[in-house]
Amino acid sequence: MRWAAATLRGKARPRGRAGVTTPAPGNRTGTCAKLRLPPQATFQVLRGNGASVGTVLMFRCPSNHQMVGSGLLTCTWKGSIAEWSSGSPVCKLVPPHETFGFKVAVIASIVSCAIILLMSMAFLTCCLLKCVKKSKRRRSNRSAQLWSQLKDEDLETVQAAYLGLKHFNKPVSGPSQAHDNHSFTTDHGESTSKLASVTRSVDKDPGIPRALSLSGSSSSPQAQVMVHMANPRQPLPASGLATGMPQQPAAYALG
C-alpha cells in the first residue's frame, strides 16, 4: 500500500508540472495561443515571432471586402495568462450597390477638381489678355498723340509759310506798279541793251504806233527798267492801241 501511494504521488507530480502551460508574469516568457487565419485574409508580423508576448500582427482583406474587427492584434499579459488583445478579424464581402456610391463620389470629386482647374486657367488667360490689350491701347494712344503733335507742328509751319508768302505777294500801292501781276526790275546795262533791241523791233513793226516806242531810255546805262507782262486774259488799257491789234508785251522805261 505504501508503494502504491508513492507511485501515485510520483505520477501526480509530473502531471501537475506538465499542466502549467503559462509561467508566472514575472518570467515574461509566456506565449499566446495560435490564431485561426480568417478566409480571404492575410496577416503580417510586425514585431515578435508570431506567438510570444509582445508580438504584433496586422491583418489585411482583399478588394471588394470589408474587415470586421480590429486589423491589429497584440499578444499581452492579462493577469497570469498571455492572450491576444482581440479576436481574429473577419473579411466580409461588400455588395456591388454599396461600392457604386463610393465610385460615384470619387468620379464627382475628380470632375469637380478638373472644372476648378479649367476655370482658374480661363481666369488667368482673361487677365493676361486684358493686360495685353491695355498695353496695346497705351501704345496706340502714344502713337496717336505723337502723330497729332507732328501734324500740329507741320500745320503751324505751313501756315507760317503761307502767311509769309501772302504778305510777300501783297500788292504795294505806288506809282511804280500799274497792274497786280508779277514784275521784275533791274538796273544793269545788259538789261538796258535788251530793252533797246525790243524797242527797235517794236519801232520797225508798222502795226504798232510810235507812241508806244521808248525814247531816250537806251542812252542812260544806269536807268532802272521795269518790264510788265500784261495778263493775256485781261484787255490792255486804251492808250492809243486799236482793238484789232495783236497783244504784245509792253515795255516801260523809268528815268
Curated annotation (Swiss-Prot):
<dbReference type="InterPro" id="IPR000436">
    <property type="entry name" value="Sushi_SCR_CCP_dom"/>
</dbReference>
<keyword id="KW-0812">Transmembrane</keyword>
<feature type="disulfide bond">
    <location>
        <begin position="32"/>
        <end position="75"/>
    </location>
</feature>
<feature type="disulfide bond">
    <location>
        <begin position="61"/>
        <end position="91"/>
    </location>
</feature>
<feature type="topological domain" description="Extracellular">
    <location>
        <begin position="1"/>
        <end position="103"/>
    </location>
</feature>
<feature type="compositionally biased region" description="Basic and acidic residues">
    <location>
        <begin position="179"/>
        <end position="191"/>
    </location>
</feature>
<feature type="region of interest" description="Disordered">
    <location>
        <begin position="1"/>
        <end position="25"/>
    </location>
</feature>
<feature type="topological domain" description="Cytoplasmic">
    <location>
        <begin position="125"/>
        <end position="255"/>
    </location>
</feature>
<keyword id="KW-0325">Glycoprotein</keyword>
<comment type="function">
    <text>May play a role in breast tumorigenesis by promoting estrogen-dependent cell proliferation, cell-cell interactions and migration.</text>
</comment>
<keyword id="KW-1003">Cell membrane</keyword>
<keyword id="KW-0768">Sushi</keyword>
<feature type="region of interest" description="Disordered">
    <location>
        <begin position="173"/>
        <end position="255"/>
    </location>
</feature>
<protein>
    <recommendedName>
        <fullName>Sushi domain-containing protein 3</fullName>
    </recommendedName>
</protein>
<feature type="domain" description="Sushi">
    <location>
        <begin position="30"/>
        <end position="93"/>
    </location>
</feature>
<feature type="transmembrane region" description="Helical">
    <location>
        <begin position="104"/>
        <end position="124"/>
    </location>
</feature>
<dbReference type="GO" id="GO:0005886">
    <property type="term" value="C:plasma membrane"/>
</dbReference>
<keyword id="KW-1133">Transmembrane helix</keyword>
<dbReference type="Pfam" id="PF00084">
    <property type="entry name" value="Sushi"/>
</dbReference>
<feature type="glycosylation site" description="N-linked (GlcNAc...) asparagine">
    <location>
        <position position="27"/>
    </location>
</feature>
<dbReference type="InterPro" id="IPR053067">
    <property type="entry name" value="SUSD3"/>
</dbReference>
<keyword id="KW-1015">Disulfide bond</keyword>
<keyword id="KW-0472">Membrane</keyword>
<dbReference type="InterPro" id="IPR035976">
    <property type="entry name" value="Sushi/SCR/CCP_sf"/>
</dbReference>
